[in-house]
Every structure is written in structure tokens, then in C-alpha cells.
From Swiss-Prot:
UniProt keywords, alphabetically: Repressor, Ribonucleoprotein, Ribosomal protein, RNA-binding, rRNA-binding, Translation regulation, tRNA-binding
PROSITE patterns: RIBOSOMAL_L1 (PS01199)
Chain's gene name: rplA
Record-given protein name: Large ribosomal subunit protein uL1
Molecular function GO labels: rRNA binding; structural constituent of ribosome; tRNA binding
Highest taxon of the lineage: Bacteria
Keyword rRNA-binding in annotation: yes
GO biological process: regulation of translation; translation
CDD domains tied to this protein: Ribosomal_L1
NCBIfam families associated with the record: rplA_bact
Length: 232
């Protein structure tokens, strides 16, 4: 515990007094202080001026990070026949129909992304209470209900990130690993911020992006200059 305490104190000292940084400055600081034995995820949290209780203020979308997430994504696909074969050939980890539904209902959710062909939605719909809270429910708005199964699986495996404003208007995601080069992390952060900016809903009032914080899995967070991050 003493070693952990020392590391934590050092990180806090490094972050003390620092705020409203550029993306480059924030990435450098977070990366330099991600010193645990495992490869920490660099995470972004954005506080948005929206009330997700209103349909016209929902923020949801998908973005392909230029340098991937560094995470191995496990993809499940609901499909039958040729589309099931297509999913397997594209690299899907789990492919099924009613059998997959029963597995999930039994409590086994061993995947990070769920894709379905449109004809499978009556089956998938029964899993709304299970997949919905985990943000795993296939949705045509983010390309996970589609006949182009191959493209959807490849996108998920290639670093595509889904985002959705949660209660309080917070959007968060992993944008890479601490082992990534700074330049690659900067590119990923820019891509994510840009995607959320473009997803501004019609019902949003006042300031849309209120706060952006960058951190690593075990490290403290640092705030970014919102105006600068959006304009980059």
C-alpha cells in the first residue's frame, strides 16, 4: 500500500494547479503519470448541457478512432443463414439466433458489441432489459442493426467507439492506451470530441460542451480548454 500511496501522491502533485489544458498538454500529462504495471486506458469524460430525459436532447453516435482503442473487442452477432456465415468470416466472436438469446437470458454476456440483422430484432427485442442498461442493444442509429454485417463487425474490431449521454448529460469513453504514442492519443481525442460536437441535438439549449476531463484508469483527471478542444 505504501508504494501505491507514493504513486498516487506523485500523480496528484503533477496534476496540482493544472487545468484548461490543450489536448496535447493533457495527453502528455496523463500519459506521463500512468505508471501502474498494466497498460492503463486513457479515458475522456464530457459534461454536456443536455437533459437526457427529453428525446430532443439525447446525444448518441459512433466514431471510428483513427488509431483504434487498443482494446480487443468481442463482437456478438444475431443473424441466420448466409448473414451468420458472413459474420463469422468477418471475425465475429459469437454468432447465433434464439440460442444466443437464451445464453444471454441465462446471464452470460461475453461481448463488448452486439450487432443484429433487421429480421432478428423481434428476437433481440426480448433482451432490451438486459442489453439496454449495458449500452449493448443493437440500434440502427449507430449502425448495429444492419444487413452489412461484414462492415459492422470490421468497424467494431477496428476501433469504432459508440457514445451515449447518460444521466446528467455525461458522455465517456476510452480513447486509447497509455502505451500509445502521444500523437496517436491526441488524434483519437480530437476525433472523439469532434464526433460529440457534431452530435449536438436540436433541443440543446445554452452551452453544449461544459467540461472535458482526460484521465487514465488509475490516475487523476485534468480538465481541457473546451473552446480550444472543440476548435482544433
Amino acid at each position: 500500500m505504501a508504494k501505491l500511496g507514493k504513486r498516487t501522491r506523485a500523480a496528484r502533485e503533477a496534476f496540482a494547479g493544472k487545468s484548461n489544458l490543450t489536448i496535447e498538454e493533457a495527453v502528455a500529462l496523463v500519459k506521463a503519470n500512468a505508471t501502474t504495471k498494466f497498460d492503463e486506458t486513457v479515458e475522456i469524460a464530457m459534461n454536456l448541457g443536455v437533459d437526457t430525459r427529453h428525446a430532443d436532447q439525447m446525444v448518441r453516435g459512433v466514431v471510428g478512432l483513427p488509431n483504434g482503442t487498443g482494446k480487443t473487442m468481442r463482437v456478438a452477432v444475431f443473424a441466420r443463414g448466409p448473414k451468420a456465415d458472413e459474420a463469422k468470416e468477418a471475425g465475429a466472436d459469437i454468432v447465433g439466433a434464439e440460442d444466443l438469446m437464451e445464453t444471454i437470458q441465462g446471464g452470460t454476456i461475453d461481448f463488448d458489441r452486439c450487432i443484429a440483422t433487421p429480421d432478428m430484432m423481434p428476437v433481440v427485442g426480448r433482451l432490451g432489459k438486459v442489453l439496454g442498461p449495458r449500452n449493448l442493444m443493437p440500434n440502427p442509429k449507430v449502425g448495429t442493426v444492419t444487413m452489412d454485417v461484414k462492415a459492422a463487425v470490421e468497424a467494431a474490431k477496428g476501433g469504432e467507439v459508440q457514445f451515449k449521454a447518460e444521466k446528467g448529460g455525461v458522455v465517456h469513453a476510452g480513447v486509447g492506451k497509455a502505451s500509445f504514442d502521444e500523437a496517436k492519443l491526441v488524434e483519437n481525442v480530437r476525433a472523439f470530441v469532434s464526433a460529440v460536437a457534431k452530435a449536438k441535438p436540436s433541443g440543446a439549449k445554452g452551452a453544449y460542451m461544459k467540461k472535458i476531463v482526460l484521465s487514465s484508469t488509475m490516475g487523476p483527471g485534468v480538465t481541457l480548454d473546451v473552446d480550444g478542444a472543440v476548435s482544433e
